[in-house]
Amino acid sequence: MVRYPAVAGSFYPADEELVLMLERFFSDLGEEGNDRRITAGVAPHAGYIFSGYTASRTYKAIFEDGLPETFVILGPNHTGLGSPIAVHPPGTWITPLGEIEVDGELAREIAKISGIADLDDLAHKYEHSIEVQVPFIQYLAEKAGKEVKIVPITLGIQDEDVAEDLGRAIFEASRELGKDVVVIASTDFMHYGQIYGYVPFRARADELPHRIKEWDFRIIRRILDFDVRGMFEEIREMNHTMCGPGGVGTAIVYSRLAGAVEAELLHYTTSFEVSRSTEAVVGYASIVFRR
């Protein structure tokens, strides 16, 4: 089963400019490490011109800590297609950088252990939130001279129960199979503006990014404390428009089970820094969890 790119040429370049862009993002990349302390990371999934640098901070940290055997990538289902909790079946994903294999053995085991996940490719066909993560992984795997696999999982339902089920299923499946895994939670934070139906406050252009950051940091503080329930409580209280809390919650649950004891915010920004528009502003964060 082959999954072809759906957003190459829109969210990220479809030609040689992609490599040039990744080289700029990773211009400060160090040597690949072998500590393997990182259990999971959070990375945004907007167009690379807006959030690519922030996402690169997550992958830089993982590379310098040591690449895993498999990345389990969780992203929100924006299209509404397919199974509510969809693990991509065995197969291959293609991007402008080439092919990357789905870890079919791990995908099947996660779906078997989980009480809610199905093997389903339809949910992934047009979804961008996972696709935009893949070129970062391919680029760094090439740098390291390693073959790295992925397990893409889309979430159409996002709550504490989903996070608990999936986080535990990923941990138990990887332990059962002896797989070295890093979980990636693909999410953007606040989506501010009439286009998103979310204008919880008004502010001058020079104040708006700071106000958005304040609201996002109420959630980020909970994430850094490994507090899944508190994160969802903050989201509900603010009616916050973070799009991938289920994946973040899953990453936290998995990380706790995998022995993580600390989390670090590596980078935060908003789309305003590029667009200079206050009509639609989105927050982006890079976070890693470590043993």
From Swiss-Prot:
CDD domains: MEMO_like. SUPFAM superfamilies: LigB-like (SSF53213). Pfam families: Memo. It comes from the Archaea. Gene3D superfamilies: LigB-like. Belongs to the MEMO1 family. HAMAP family: MEMO1. This is MEMO1 family protein TK1477. It comes from Thermococcus kodakarensis (strain ATCC BAA-918 / JCM 12380 / KOD1). The lineage of its organism: Archaea, Methanobacteriati, Methanobacteriota, Thermococci, Thermococcales.
